[in-house]
């Protein structure tokens, strides 16, 4: 049975049993700073398991993309050398959120593997946690197994947890026996399914608390079960990897080196999925993990004797619908990102080639005298890593092949010394977990109804919650207080998708004071207002579907349950619309002019400007920028209609809509259509492109490896920018005494004249230096030459000093540079062993000096400097 068929059967089986199919979440976990990558199927349901997040879903089934490189689950070093380790893999899973528990979960698992997959139950065995008597009883009833086939395990192998903290519970594992006597036990018996009975949540101290609801989390490695179904005991012999490895062997040959081909296939697949989610090679965090994967694969390509970029040539196998390695159907992001993936892989291979060759040669040099069993020093490995950029894991791979040990402690010490030097500059990742308070509020009041697409003002919004500046719930706020307000509905756009939040005001009507003292409020926060209250909305954020209005009470007061008029700043809102729609047009133009490898990496939509970050490996030329700008302005002049549609995710992508790589969308998405531009977007937009008026690019630059940034203006801001440039041009024209259209030629002439003048001035200075009355005295058989140049630049004096080649001579000159005295000291080569200029100057000035033993230049106090040098030479 093929891998794709197994996945399909699994999903359909559980859908038939009333499970909702939930699509894979991104490899980059959302709102979870505890994980670098999604490493299990349950990650996207973590907040549901803990009770933080509420859901209407009772049962779910998924095929989840997973990556295990780093942290508790790190399989990188084992890849290629074992039969079952991967960096990227798919995890099939069924989940229950307070619905069914152990008995039903075990029944589902048994039915699927014995009926859907038709596995021989005599080849199966079960493990359970040693105290889990309930699971033992259920397995006995469902499977009919004897005691020796249901094994109790007392270790943590059968008590599952995601990490040091989080949901956990006892688990039951299903094993398959290949029953081949020529296999080692580790290869013969393989775990194929893990059923986790989520009952607890583990805190940072290791304490276990009962979860609000008992849940089920199961995980079946798709590659492992495919190996069982295809009767191969090495995962890399299944249909998917066979196709990738065949393509690798087609280019590289050397079929005997199986480990190298396995590593290439595994790392290529992992890298492709990361790039498809917008991760690009870099030197930190997830970007560095991607770089490690690509570079480790490149090292094995080089080992196979293939010296040209290769990964981008193998990648198309993953999106070839006729290939057994086809993954583009289930994961269409691979197809959408084809150009970006191929460009990134090729570029990274090309950039790493010289480093790889140099590093391998240096490692050979460091290990020339080492025999198997000897140890490479940690300092040498760190020098390769830190100075030459040679990855440590590649060093370890090569040492492993040569049976040379590695001084891990020495490497760690060198690394720690480097970290100490950089620690003062470290600022952390900046990631924050979602605060519990927002979950509690949305659970109590529900989502904020956003009406800002249709309205810029609503007159009947109800105040549901008021939070103090310390995020404490309060009943009311008075003049001068900074607060956060949550309404039942709002026209204010909450900052998201790169677009900043709306600003504006709340008008709170006056209330007749309560005269009956018997019903007077017990606290001092009164909701009685003789005059209307006004709250200024300074920003709006969106957190977990709650719209948070950050306000300051300008006058009067505001109270819980008040009915307010909520008004956005309409002019500012319109400017945001212009810039957001212009960003879509810019994205469209970039892909047309530069290629469809361009994808959005980030954006800022502010009322006065826009910023767009995108993937591209080279500088955008001036001609290309002009073409991009012209295309956007042409689309503006066409006055195209901008409209939105709510569609299913699959339908939107099928119609060519652009989505942000790595972002998880719901079943229904909002698509913004502007001409041929289609993007998934929740922002506010113009009704027609003509409202944008004008588009002007002001800067283009690199912000990271493979990522460029364009900043631009629209509307009146663009007009003002053009007008300011015109005014500046006219001023320049007046200064150079030329018409505006002749400024360039006039400046060229003036620049040439300036260079000629500088040459003449320099020549005159040299003559002045030579004409100075420079004194020389003899000290202990050497000449001491000193002079103070008061009107000659230091660079001229330095050049003159370097020209002096008289033996047994010490020269000390002072000159002026930017109104400061500069000391220049030179010692002839035959005196360098006796007198160092660095030591001499440090002694007489009291400072730390650089340069070299023969020549040193530094700032100094001009008074008595020559006397001090004389004393040093005669000591």
Curated annotation (Swiss-Prot):
Q: What compartments host this protein?
A: Cytoplasm
Q: Name one GO cellular component term.
A: cytosol
Which coenzymes or cofactors are required? Zn(2+)
Q: Would I find Lyase among this entry's keywords? A: no
Q: Which InterPro entries match?
A: aa-tRNA-synth_II/BPL/LPL, Ala-tRNA-lgiase_IIc, Ala-tRNA-ligase_IIc_anticod-bd, Ala-tRNA-synth_IIc_core, Ala-tRNA-synth_IIc_N, Ala-tRNA_ligase, Ala_tRNA_ligase_euk/bac, Thr/Ala-tRNA-synth_IIc_edit
Enzyme class comes to: ligase
A Pfam family recorded for this sequence: tRNA-synt_2c
Similarity comment: Belongs to the class-II aminoacyl-tRNA synthetase family.
Functional summary from the UniProt entry: Catalyzes the attachment of alanine to tRNA(Ala) in a two-step reaction: alanine is first activated by ATP to form Ala-AMP and then transferred to the acceptor end of tRNA(Ala). Also edits incorrectly charged Ser-tRNA(Ala) and Gly-tRNA(Ala) via its editing domain.
Question: What is the protein name stated in its UniProt record?
Answer: Alanine--tRNA ligase
Organism per entry: Wolbachia sp. subsp. Brugia malayi (strain TRS)
Q: What is the lineage of its organism?
A: Bacteria, Pseudomonadati, Pseudomonadota, Alphaproteobacteria, Rickettsiales
């Amino acid at each position: 049975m093929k891998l794709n068929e197994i996945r399909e059967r699994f999903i359909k089986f559980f859908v038939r049993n009333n499970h909702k199919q939930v699509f894979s979440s991104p490899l980059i976990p959302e709102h979870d700073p505890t994980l670098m990558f999604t490493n299990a199927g349950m990650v996207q349901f973590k907040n549901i398991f803990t009770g933080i997040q509420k859901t209407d879903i009772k049962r779910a089934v998924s095929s989840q993309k997973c990556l295990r490189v780093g942290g508790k689950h790190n399989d990188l070093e084992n890849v290629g050398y074992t039969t079952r380790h991967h960096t990227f893999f798919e995890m099939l899973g069924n989940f229950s959120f307070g619905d069914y528990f152990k008995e039903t979960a075990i029944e589902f698992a048994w039915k699927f593997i014995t009926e859907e997959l038709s596995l021989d139950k005599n080849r199966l065995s079960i493990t359970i946690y040693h105290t889990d008597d309930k699971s033992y009883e259920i397995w006995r009833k469902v499977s009919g197994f004897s005691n020796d086939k249901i094994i109790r395990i007392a270790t943590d192998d059968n008590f599952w947890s995601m990490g040091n903290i989080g949901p956990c519970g006892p688990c039951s594992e299903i094993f398959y026996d290949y029953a081949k006597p020529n296999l080692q036990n580790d290869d013969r018996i393989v775990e194929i399914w893990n059923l986790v009975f989520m009952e607890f949540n583990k805190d940072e101290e290791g304490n276990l608390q009962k979860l609000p609801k008992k849940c089920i989390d199961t995980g079946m490695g798709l590659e492992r079960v495919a190996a069982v179904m295809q009767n191969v005991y090495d995962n890399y012999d299944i249909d998917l990897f066979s196709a990738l490895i065949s393509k690798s062997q087609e280019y590289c040959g050397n079929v005997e080196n199986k480990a190298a081909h396995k590593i290439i296939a595994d790392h290529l697949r992992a890298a492709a999925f990361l790039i498809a989610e917008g991760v690009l090679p870099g030197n930190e965090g997830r970007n560095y993990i991607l770089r490690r994967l690509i570079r480790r694969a490149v090292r094995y390509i080089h080992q196979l004797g293939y010296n040209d970029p290769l990964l981008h040539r193998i990648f198309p196998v993953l999106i070839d619908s006729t290939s057994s390695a086809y993954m583009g159907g289930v994961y269409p992001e691979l197809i959408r990102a084809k150009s970006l993936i191929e460009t990134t892989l090729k570029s990274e291979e090309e950039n790493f080639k010289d480093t790889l060759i140099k590093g391998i040669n240096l490692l050979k040099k460091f290990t020339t005298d080492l025999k198997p069993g000897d140890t490479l020093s940690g300092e040498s490995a760190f020098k390769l890593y830190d100075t030459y950029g040679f990855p440590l894991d590649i060093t370890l791979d090569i040492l492993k092949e040569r049976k040379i040990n590695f001084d891990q402690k020495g490497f760690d010490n060198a690394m720690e010394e480097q970290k100490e030097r950089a620690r003062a500059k470290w600022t952390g990742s900046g990631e924050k977990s979602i605060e519990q308070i927002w979950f509690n509020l949305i659970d109590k009041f529900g989502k904020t109804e956003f009406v800002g697409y249709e309205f810029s003002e609503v007159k009947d919004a109800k105040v549901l919650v008021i939070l103090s500046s310390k995020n404490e719930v309060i009943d009311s706020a008075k003049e001068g207080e900074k607060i956060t307000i949550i309404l039942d509905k709002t026209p204010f756009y909450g900052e998201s998708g790169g677009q900043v939040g709306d600003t504006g005001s709340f008008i709170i009507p006056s209330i007749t004071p309560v005269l009956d003292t018997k019903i007077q409020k017990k606290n001092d926060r009164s909701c009685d207002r003789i005059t209307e209250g006004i709250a200024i909305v300074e920003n709006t954020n969106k957190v977990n579907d709650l719209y948070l209005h950050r306000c300051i009470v300008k006058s009067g007061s505001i109270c819980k349950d008040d009915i307010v008029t909520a008004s956005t700043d309409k002019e500012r809102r319109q400017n945001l619309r212009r810039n957001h729609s212009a960003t879509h047009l810019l994205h469209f133009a970039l892909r047309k002019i530069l290629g469809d490898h361009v994808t959005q990496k980030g954006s800022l939509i502010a009322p006065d400007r826009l910023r767009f970050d995108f993937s591209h490996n080279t500088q955008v030329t001036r001609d290309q920028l002009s073409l991009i700008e012209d295309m956007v302005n042409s689309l503006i002049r066409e006055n195209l209609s901008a409209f939105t549609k709510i569609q299913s995710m699959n339908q939107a992508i099928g119609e060519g809509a652009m989505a942000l790589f790595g972002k998880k969308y719901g079943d229904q998405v909002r698509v913004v259509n502007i001409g041929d531009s289609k993007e998934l977007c929740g922002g506010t937009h113009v009704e027609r492109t003509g409202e944008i008026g004008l588009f002007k690019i002001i800067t283009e630059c690199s912000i990271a490896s493979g990522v460029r940034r364009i900043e631009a203006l629209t509307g009146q801001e663009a007009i003002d920018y053009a007008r300011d440039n015109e005014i500046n041009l006219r001023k320049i024209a007046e200064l150079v005494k030329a018409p505006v259209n002749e400024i360039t030629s006039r400046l060229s002439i003036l620049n040439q004249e300036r260079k000629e003048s500088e040459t003449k001035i320099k020549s005159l200075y040299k003559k002045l230096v030579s004409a100075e009355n420079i004194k020389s005295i003899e000290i202990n058989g050497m000449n001491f030459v000193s002079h103070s140049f008061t009107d000659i630049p230091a660079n001229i004096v330095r050049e003159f000093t370097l020209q002096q080649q008289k033996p047994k001579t010490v020269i000390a000159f002072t000159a002026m540079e930017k109104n400061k005295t500069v000391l220049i000291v030179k010692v002839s080569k035959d005196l360098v062993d006796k007198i160092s200029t660095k030591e001499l100057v440090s002694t007489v000035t009291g400072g730390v000096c650089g340069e070299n033993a023969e020549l040193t230049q530094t700032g100094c106090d001009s008074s008595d400097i020559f006397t001090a040098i004389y004393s040093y030479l005669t000591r």
